[in-house]
C-alpha cells in the first residue's frame, strides 16, 4: 500500500547521522530531510511550537481504499521526533470532522496535559487548536487518541525523543509501527462482540464516538491443557499493518552495507500482540517502553499491545535484504518491513508463517533488568487489582467494577506504591498506567528486579506486581490496553489525595 509519492523518489544516500535525523517521526528509515513547519507561537523558553495535525487520510489496504485517521507532524510524516533536550512544545490542530483528544503514551507530563478526557480536560473540538508544553523523557513512545475508538481507525503515531547518547551512537534509526486494521467501523466490531453475547459497552454515552466509518468479531482459542482454553484474539482483522502497509507491498528501508541500525518497535495495535522475528539477524534489546534495560541478545521478541522495544542490529557487510517480521500471536498472519542494502534485490515475504505463533508469555519479561531501577524502598501503600471478565457475556472489569462506575486507587504524593494485578481470565491484559513509569517487581509472586516501563502484560491466570513513586499529582487512568476490553469497562483511576 502506498500513501505518498515517496516510493517514486530515488533513494538518497546519507550518512548514519543524517539518516537518523531525517527519519523524524516517519514510520521508518531513510527519507530526505524536509523543511520543518512550525506554528508561530513560542513557549516561555522561546522555542517555536511544533504543529501536529489530527485529521482524515486515505490508505490502500490489500488493493482497497480505506478512509482512516492520522496524526501528521511538522515534516508531513506521522508523529513527532524531538532532539535531545527539546521541549514537547506542540500545537495540536484538529482537522478531523469530530472531536478528539491525544494521549502521549508513556510520557510524564502534568496530568492536565496527559490527553485523557477528564471533565477538566475535555476533548478538542473539530477545528480547534490546543497547545502542550512540558519537558519530555527520552526514548521510544507513541501518541494515540483516547476518544472513543479512534485508535482503531489509526489515530496514532510514533513519538520519538532522542537522547544525547542516541546522537553519539550514530546509528541509522528505523521506526516500525504495528497496527491492526478492519474495513468495518470499530463500533461495528465492538457491537459484534457485545450484542452477540447479550451485553452492551460499559462506556457512557458522552459524545465520545469514533467519528470515522471505514470482519466480524470472533474469538481465536488455543488449548492450554486440562480442559482450559486461552483466548487470544477477539477480532478477525482484514489486515495487519507495518508503517501503514502489508506484506503485499512492504516498506523497503535502504541501509548501508554492514550498517548499524537502531530499530524502534511500537505496537500500536488495538487488540493484537505480536512476535517480532529478525530472521537471519541477531539483535540486542536495549530498552523497553523507552526505558533502558541491560542488554538481551536474540532474534525473536514478544511485543504486547502498547509496548515498545529498542533493538540494536549490526547488519552483515554483504549486499543483503533482511525481512523484519511481526507475527500475530495464535495465528499465521504476519506483517513487517525489509531492511536492504542499496542495490540489493528484495523478495516479497510471505504474508503467512508456516505455523501459528505461540501465546505471548513471560519468557522475556523475567529476563529484563532495568539499567536505572527504582531506589530500594518498602511500599507505603499496596493495592490489589483483580482482572476479570469473559467473552460471553463480553464484559471486562477491574475489582468487579466497570468504568466509569469505579472506586479510584488512592495514593498520596511521596508514597511508594505497589499494585498487584491478578488475572482471573483466559485472556492476556496489557495494563497501562498513565503519568508514571513503574518497575516490575514480581511475576506470580516470585520477586524480581525487573524492567522500568509503562505497560506490562498480565498473562492469563497469573499475576504481576509493579511499584512506582507517587511523584506526579493528578488523576491518572489505569487500564487494559486492549481497546475492546477498555471500552467494556476495564479501566480505573489512580487518584492523588490532593485531588479530592
What are these regions (language model features)?
Residues 100-105, 272-278, 430-433:
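Short, hydrophobic/aromatic beta-strand segments
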Residues 75, 79-82, 106-137, 168-170, ...:
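Extracytoplasmic beta-sandwich strand-turn segments characteristic of Greek-key/jelly-roll folds
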Residues 1-14:
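N-terminal secretory signal peptides
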Residues 113-118, 122-124, 223-363, 443-451:
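Histidine- and aromatic-rich segments of cupredoxin/plastocyanin-like copper-binding domains
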Residues 92-96, 266-267, 421-425:
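Asparagine-centered strand-capping/turn motif at beta-strand->loop junctions
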Residues 177-274, 377-380, 396:
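A contiguous, surface-exposed recognition patch within enzymatic or periplasmic domains that forms
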Residues 2, 38-154, 162, 206, ...:
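Extracytoplasmic/lumenal soluble domains of exported proteins with redox or metal-associated functions
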Residues 21-22, 29-51, 153-213, 291-428, ...:
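Extended terminal and domain-junction accessory segments
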